[in-house]
Amino acid sequence: MTTIVSVRRNGHVVIAGDGQATLGNTVMKGNVKKVRRLYNDKVIAGFAGGTADAFTLFELFERKLEMHQGHLVKAAVELAKDWRTDRMLRKLEALLAVADETASLIITGNGDVVQPENDLIAIGSGGPYAQAAARALLENTELGAREIAEKALDIAGDICIYTNHFHTIEELTAKA
């Protein structure tokens, strides 16, 4: 598994992920980039789950973004509908965390599109640890979104055996 965390604060949104890929109990690669930019760099997305499945979902999500002129929520709902109802897509095992300037969402294969409280997302095996750390930092510090995401990933990497300390971080800034 993995850890993906997204934090939104003071006009900045960040999605960050670790780089560990495992096959069963064996680490196969330590520098996988599980976070990327989509739709002309206006959307950032991260995945937890099977790498090949996630890349397929990224491609489909980018097509949905193009169909809906970059409208994140509409594209997410359409992807979730297809993911749930299409016989082949239903077999894909991954979770997506996506964000643009205004919204942060979790998209699941069950057809769920969730906009979490406080615009804080944490998915994957280290998600609960990263979420707890990020929430504590959001509530008790003035750190920026990027610093919070980095610290949350570090803490998850210290606790979760399926999360490492190689980070990929993407950030968007809201236009003034």
Curated annotation (Swiss-Prot):
One of its GO terms (cellular component) is proteasome core complex. PROSITE patterns: PROTEASOME_BETA_2. Its EC number is 3.4.25.2. Induction: By heat shock. GO terms for biological process: proteolysis involved in protein catabolic process. It holds the Pfam family Proteasome. InterPro entries: ATP-dep_Prtase_HsIV_su, Ntn_hydrolases_N, Proteasome_sua/b, Proteasome_suB-type. It is found in: Cytoplasm. Allosterically activated by HslU binding. Belongs to the peptidase T1B family. HslV subfamily. Protease subunit of a proteasome-like degradation complex believed to be a general protein degrading machinery. This is ATP-dependent protease subunit HslV. It comes from Salmonella typhimurium (strain LT2 / SGSC1412 / ATCC 700720). The gene is hslV.
